[in-house]
Amino acid sequence: MPIITRLPDSVANKISAGEVVQRPASVVKELLENAIDAGATKISVTIKDAGKELIRIADNGVGMNRDDALLCVERFATSKIKSADDLDALHTLGFRGEALASICSVSHFELKTRQADATLGLLFRYDGGSLVEELEVQAEQGTSFSVRNLFYNVPARRKFLKSNATEYHHLFEIVKSFTLAYPEIEWRMVNDDEELFNFKNNDVLERLNFYYGDDFASSLIEVAEQNDYLPIHGYLGKPALQKKRKLEQYFFINRRLVQNRMLLQAVQQAYGDLLVERQTPFVLLFLTIDPSRIDVNVHPAKLEIRFDDERQVRSMFYPVIKRAVQLHDFSTNISVIEPFASASEPFVGSSSQPIFSSTSSQAPRMGGGSRRFDLSDAPERAITKNELYRNYREGAFSSPSVASYDAPSPLQQGGLFALASAEESLFGAQAVHEASENIEAFQLSPLDNIVEHKEVEPKIWQLHNKYLICQIKTGLMIIDQHVAHERVLYERALEVMQQNVPNAQQLLFPQKVEFRAWEYEVFEEIRDDLYRLGFNVRLFGNRTVMIEGVPQDVKSGSEVTILQDMITQYQENATKLKLERRDNLAKSYSCRNAIMTGQKLSMEEMRSLIDNLFATREPYTCPHGRPIIIKLSLDQLDKMFGRK
């Protein structure tokens, strides 16, 4: 007697449904793909009870005749491909012919359809995959799928569905991704009898503003790259829009939403230090590639893809993202996000909400006529580092018709990272003697192009010995002095180590350091790079060393503390962040050696710090991703004071 038997189709469909239909969001995705493949220009999504009670997708596509309508719910029935070779030339979202059969088998399923030349439409009702009713009915052109009581006949699957809030979140994210990928389609969504949106225009930026807030689109970097192999277009978020949710990173390949680790890592690396630890930037990118170069038949959900030559794709993708990131000003703006209160209403009201708060992509609006300001990075326009520096230099003049300034380059400064002698640099002993008393804790390299006449210098104030407030041509610029100096020291340290020329000043009296066992192990690991950085250290007994020279920007008397703190910071970074050795060392050095909050600076020190900051590659964030610069425009001030 045979033991192996062929499963009935009803059982097989339920089993395959476990792969294709994992939750209500899976149903929505499959049905939306069918609607788009049918050439729809209008699609409506109706949901009840987070999709557990009802999912209805209606479109105005081509519709189906009776034979196709009956066949579409059979396994492996599809109009998308005819042979395996067609998989190499896919121009549709669906292709397997499994989804409708799987959905139909685990729900009360209804299909209504009418073609353009038909007088009446057709209605088919299924219970658990079995046809129970067929009717001719009045219907609009196109197709409507209604899925009721999902998993009603698979209680184990229904039991493992999450809360309505969770299931609705997944479902809404799927719908949102399609509305962004297909702006030419009119989209309408209704949840529990409440209309959520009804998009009739084809502006993807307006849709982004709807989802994330009115100023969101102005905070994006546009990406556009045309080539024969991998055209790329879309938008990238500025660092202040960082979110931990990966659903806010949308990669569409041939307009199919995909997940690909290489693309994620390439974007992350392109942003580099602009990102705060464990955060990711907002991404909405569309990539077009020959269908024969990708494999979308990797997983039943069709979210994963493989490239035939991933290395080549990355070599073309990464430079585009890196270039887009480098060409934009990432300084933070303070922007007004609520209209000004009317004269009859209080300015702030009784709300306990702070007037200034961090940006949130889903921040609730404040009612009662109250007004709220937001720390966002929405600029009036995207500007470059040089333009921001000119804005700062021209802030000293009341008239805009003044000579332009370019951001200082390393060459203009005699080398920002140049290995100047003690007599040539403010880091030298002679300069320390001649400088003001306020310069004891740090020194910065002089600039060859500092303007000689004080009356044309930018106006700078130090606030609470923590922030530098600068008048710029368009308003105000606020700089965190600690992280600004940290950025300068970080890039200088990397350059010095790469040049492999020790940048040390010898100590008159060598300093002894006794390490603990683990500290000495770390010291041995980074000993060569410490020497390149400028630490001239000689072994002196068991786990003991003598510091005979240090980098020129190490404060006298802090040599031992700096070295010990660096080693501690290095170990912490190695454990948490998995950084490359020199990058880790540069971060540790700059963090421990930068000027501190509470330290008073002279006017010359403040000017030198700002000029050195704008000579760096990334003046907007510290090596750990914290913002350095915040801007407040005159226009924003006028709005805050009700002048506009």
Swiss-Prot record:
Keyword DNA repair tagged: yes
Keyword DNA repair: yes
GO biological process: mismatch repair
GO molecular function, a single term: mismatched DNA binding
Cellular component annotations (GO), alphabetically ordered: mismatch repair complex
Keyword annotations: DNA damage, DNA repair
Disulfide bonds: none
Source organism, top-level taxon: Bacteria
Pfam families assigned to the protein according to its UniProt record, in alphabetical order: DNA_mis_repair, HATPase_c_3, MutL_C
UniProt-listed PANTHER family: DNA MISMATCH REPAIR PROTEIN MLH, PMS, MUTL, DNA MISMATCH REPAIR PROTEIN MLH1
Annotated family: Belongs to the DNA mismatch repair MutL/HexB family.
Function summary: This protein is involved in the repair of mismatches in DNA. It is required for dam-dependent methyl-directed DNA mismatch repair. May act as a 'molecular matchmaker', a protein that promotes the formation of a stable complex between two or more DNA-binding proteins in an ATP-dependent manner without itself being part of a final effector complex.
Protein name per its UniProtKB record: DNA mismatch repair protein MutL
Source organism per UniProt: Chlorobium chlorochromatii (strain CaD3)
Gene: mutL
